[in-house]
A protein has these predicted regions:
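Phosphate/nucleotide-binding beta-alpha loop and adjacent structural elements of enzyme active sites
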Residues: 1-177
Length: 177
């Protein structure tokens, strides 16, 4: 089940932006690429895993698919997400969340960073989401976390937080004079 894929390598201090997905035009330069072997999780033979952290620069959904049926043996995932397409054909958070919910996971928490209040190809919000297998939660917890998820992921919420931070910076500069 191994496959050979092209890794687009970001230059210099942006090397953390290297990805298996082709880059969009941006301020980050990708002057080289290299062929790498991509393995499915199921081919690694690992067992008894309590938590998985996935940060693969837009390739998270493909990594999750590589878990196949073993995904339901893992109680907890922390997954990087973006609500904009930072790389060509990058699944956005909505698609990632739908996949996880169909597999029986509930989004419990997010660490979210907002670089643009309204998502477009040049930015939006991104961060990490914690998912827990719903079999480990009470029904009331599932309801609570589901409502909180929808409130936190409204674009209006992102815009509010973004402009609130800008207002604070402006006030500090104005008051600091």
């Amino acid at each position: 089940n191994d496959s050979i894929s092209k890794l687009y390598v970001a230059d210099g201090e942006d090397s953390g932006s290297s990805s298996l997905l082709a880059p969009r035009e941006s301020e980050i330069t990708f002057s080289t690429s290299q062929e790498i072997t991509v393995k499915k999780f199921t081919s690694l033979g690992l067992k008894n895993i309590d938590m998985v952290v996935i940060d693969t620069q837009g390739y998270e959904l493909e990594v999750l698919k590589g878990f196949e049926s073993y995904i339901n043996a893992i109680p907890c995932f922390i997954i990087e997400f973006a609500n904009y397409e930072g790389y060509l054909k990058q699944p956005v958070y909505k698609e990632l969340n739908l996949f996880m919910r169909k597999k029986g996971f509930v989004p419990i928490a997010q660490i979210k960073r907002i670089n643009k209040p309204f998502p477009n190809i040049n930015g939006g919000s991104f961060g990490d989401a914690l998912y827990v297998d719903k079999k480990l939660l009470r029904k009331s917890e599932i309801i609570f976390f589901t409502i909180r998820y929808y409130l936190i992921n409204l674009i209006i919420y992102d815009a509010f937080i973004f402009f609130k931070k800008r207002l604070k910076k402006s006030l500090k500069r104005y008051i600091g004079r």
